[in-house]
Amino acid sequence: MPILPVPALNALLTKTIKTIKTGAAKNAHQHHVLHHTLKGLDNLPAPVLERINRRLKASTAEQYPLADAHLRLILAISNKLKRPLAIDKLPKLRQKFGTDAVSLQAPSVWQQNADASGSTENAVSWQDKTIANADGGDMTVRCYQKSTQNSERKSTDEAAMLFFHGGGFCIGDIDTHHEFCHTVCAQTGWAVVSVDYRMAPEYPAPTALKDCLAAYAWLAEHSQSLGASPSRIVLSGDSAGGCLAALVAQQVIKPIDALWQDNNQAPAADKKVNDTFKNSLADLPRPLAQLPLYPVTDYEAEYPSWELYGEGLLLDHNDAEVFNSAYTQHSGLPQSHPLISVMHGDNTQLCPSYIVVAELDILRDEGLAYAELLQKEGVQVQTYTVLGAPHGFINLMSVHQGLGNQTTYIINEFACLVQNLLTSEGDKPNLRA
C-alpha cells in the first residue's frame, strides 16, 4: 500500500483526533477507530513517524530513549485528546474515557463472545452478573471463562483471577479493561472476574475497597461454578486497581475495625446490612498471589519519578492530585490510613506478589518502594519494570506491538509463579492465619 505524504498523514491524524475529541463519531468505540488508527501507524517507516512526531511536538528519542517512535506518537495523540482534569468534570471524563478505552481495543475480543463454542483455541465467553455490594446494593461483575471444545465436566480446582480496573478510583469500568481480562482468560485458562466497584467522588474511600472485598467473598463462595477453587484466588488490578488488589490482600488476611465504621459522611448504614458484610468476610480463604500493575501505593511521600515523569505523559501531576483529592478528601480518613495506603497496612503475612511498574510513570518509584517493603517483611516478591512504557500501558496492548509482547510476558510470568506456588504447596488449605 502506498504511503501518504507526511502532510496528508498529518491532516488525516488531525481529522481523526478532532472527530474523537468533539464526539462527532457517535459510535467510534463500536468501530474501534482508535485501535485501527494507532495500530496502523506502526506500518509507517520510522523516519516518517519521527517527522510526524516533530510536527506534533511529540517527545523525542533523547527524552525517552527506550520508547520507540510509534509509542511516542501514540503519547502525542493522547495528549491532543486529553482535557484538563478537575473534580467537577469527572462524570464527563468517565464517559469519554470509557468510550476511548473501548475504541482502543481489538475488535476480536468483543466478537468472540458470539463464537464461544470452542471452535477457536482462545475462544472466551463472558457473562455479566449482578451481586451485592458492601452496602447491599447492586454491583456488576463480569465473569470470563475459556470456552471448552467438548461437553466434559469442567474442573473445579483451577485458579481464578479477581481483577480491579484502574482509573484513579474515579473513572474506568469493566468495559475499559475488557481486553486485558479477556487476554488473561485466553492465555491462562483461568476464570477471570472483573469488578465494577463504586467510584469517587460520589463514593469516596473506603467504599471501593469494601465493594472489592464483597466481590472477593462472592468469588470465594461461587468459585466452583466457574471451575475454580476458593483457595486458588489470585488478585490483580492496574493503577488504582493495583492498590485495591493489595488492600484486599491485606484485609482478607487481617481485617481492621475501621471497615465496619461509616467513614463516608453519609447516613449511617443499616446495621443488618453492615453485619451481613462483616460476616461475609469471616474465615475467607486467603489469596494465593497478587499481580499489582503500576499500583498506587503511597499518598504521602514523593519519589524521584514524580519529578521525572510528572508532565506530558498519560498520568501527570494534576491528574494524580485530582484523583487523590476526589478519593480521599471526604473519606474521613487520613491519607496514611491503612484502608487507603498499602504502605501503612499490615504486610507481614501478605501473599506472594509479582509487582509490575512502568519506566515512564509517575508512580514507578512508589511501586518499587512497596516491593522493597514487602521484601523487608519477608514476603515472597518479584518485580518487573517495563522499559520505555508509560502508565496505563495495558490499555495499549493491542495497538503497540512491544507493549502487547510485554503484557503477554507479564501474564505468562505470573501464571508460572502461580503454578509454582501450587506445586510447592501441594494445594494445602489456604485459610486466614
Swiss-Prot record:
Outcome reported for the amino acid change (mutating H165Q): Loss of lipase and esterase activity
Catalytic activity: a triacylglycerol + H2O = a diacylglycerol + a fatty acid + H(+)
Temperature and activity: Active at temperatures close to 0 degree Celsius.
One GO molecular-function entry: triacylglycerol lipase activity
Residue numbers annotated as active site: S239, D361, H391
EC number: 3.1.1.3
Top-rank EC class of the record's enzyme: hydrolase
Keywords, ordered alphabetically: Hydrolase, Lipid degradation, Lipid metabolism
SUPFAM superfamilies reported for this sequence: alpha/beta-Hydrolases (SSF53474)
Keyword Hydrolase: yes
GO BP annotation list: lipid catabolic process
UniProt record similarity statement: Belongs to the 'GDXG' lipolytic enzyme family.
Name by which UniProt lists this protein: Lipase 2
Species: Moraxella sp. (strain TA144)
